Amino acid sequence: MGGLAATAALPAFAEGTDCASSASAPVCRREELQSELIAKWNDGTEAVSPQVYGQYLRDGDTRGFWALDALERAFEKVMREAKETTVAGDVPAVWSVYNMGYIVKTRESLFSIDLVHRRDAEFASLLDFALITHNHGDHWRHGFYGAMDGAHKTVVSNFKDNYGVKNRKQDGGYVRGVKTFRIKDVEIRTSLIDHNDYLIDFTAAFEIKTGDFIIYHTGDSGRGTEPKLGTAWGRPDLWLFFPGCGVNTAKAVEKVNAKRIVFGHLWELGHPQGHRGRLDKRDLRPRLAAAKTAGCENVSVAFWGDRII
């Protein structure tokens, strides 16, 4: 099915907000509008198979697919707004780029978490450092890592050596686990959680503190890892959460007790529709409901390009 023909009824990328996201203000949406957009984005991404997405990554041709055009515009929007935005207090500016990828700006720093995009290396010159939760291709790309490493910028992960943030054991393995450090005005605490039943302690969760504001990013979290979730520095102001890979949403929400939750990993195009690594409409709606039932009233999704705070 052709890209444009399949998505002709969808709204323009800039539409669909009650208050437009910009360099000076985050997006906000009524719950009813969010529900409508979930359905429309689900239809718009359905036409893009993993094979088509792979071709786009290789040659940059969107082939008229609405979702791929949206992905290009999202990147340009976030880069433009990140350059234009000034942060004065402890509360950072946070943008959703794609999947579990976010850009965060504080008073002194600009950094990424799990940034993945065809053009992600273009951000390297702007960033002070980057965080990567785990060694899967939908959470990091070699070109981006190479650009950061080549520019002598810190990349924090649990699988790459970079400027002393992570040390090697004498036997050649990696020191993995809880580590706390500071980069400019950002304090970071790492811990390990399970990606799924067999990738135990595979994901590095990041507790990120700027002043008194706490962001918690848990990458991919799987079934049974709920007891490992949680922050040491206080209740998270914002939890960037993927309720897939088998994690029990209600148990996780009760354990973390975040003030606000934003779901990520939406419509990850490298996975086929229906795969648990791709949060589609079928699974998204009940998990939004489960998070609210578990006690978090402020739970939402971030579409590509949204400024969250």
Question: For the regions a protein language model found, what residue spans apply to each?
Answer:
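Active-site environment of divalent metal-dependent phosphoester hydrolases
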Residues: R119-D120, H136-W140, D161-G164, K179-F181, ...
